[in-house]
Amino acid sequence: KYFSVGASANYNFGKFNYEKFNLMNGVNYGVFSNSSSEITGFTYNFSSNVLIPLKNNLSLSILFSLYPEGELDSYNIESLYTSNASSISLESLGDFVDIDLDARGLENTKLPVPKKSIYSIGLEKKNSWFIGAQYENKLSSGFENVFLDIRNVSYRDANSISFGGYFIPDSSSLVSYWKRIKYRFGIKNDKKSIIVNNLPINQFSLNLGLGLPIAGLSKANLGLEIGKIGNDDLIKENYFSLRLGLSLNDVWFIKRKYN
């Protein structure tokens, strides 16, 4: 009743492209390289959750998720082009040659998937408030892409810490709409796995949100994320994003028998 376990399998597919252009002063033609990888394969996730009832309608939840180390299949292609301009376009590309990756053992490779663990804990008073924290760790320091070996890029173990929750002033209020709104908040500090030019990349974000009651038990969810990523010695980006979502109760999809 208070303990549950679960597992899931995910099929991953997609394509990565890496483009590079070399142009030297005094040389009319530059060299443009295009490397691409088509990724396919399964990843797995195992989770366990403990829900502990407490006094005063409180409950404590503890969650652990494990993403085991794995591998994805990578089919790789690399082509070299000559170009007679300082900017790349279809018109500027000249002769090209496809690299024989099979002879180098790089046409079909394995892309490692690092092991990831997630630990979460939260305290909730149902339909009133929630406060929680989450720690995520990814063992990515040994990650290596043998096909796309970028010289100025290395990897480290990644981790992130986040805190957040929600508050509903009075979920059963019949007088004030604003008291039935779910007010969400959260902060996250993320240490990325990638290192560029020996400089680590970190991300910090602040999240605010509103759960707006609409017909029945459905809600319209509004979210705002404000954050920064990178560092002053490399590339630093300040950003914000807006999100809108709908959570529809199944009563919307039940055909009425009487009008």
Regions found by a protein language model. Name each.
Residues 1-259:
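Outer-membrane beta-barrel porins/channels
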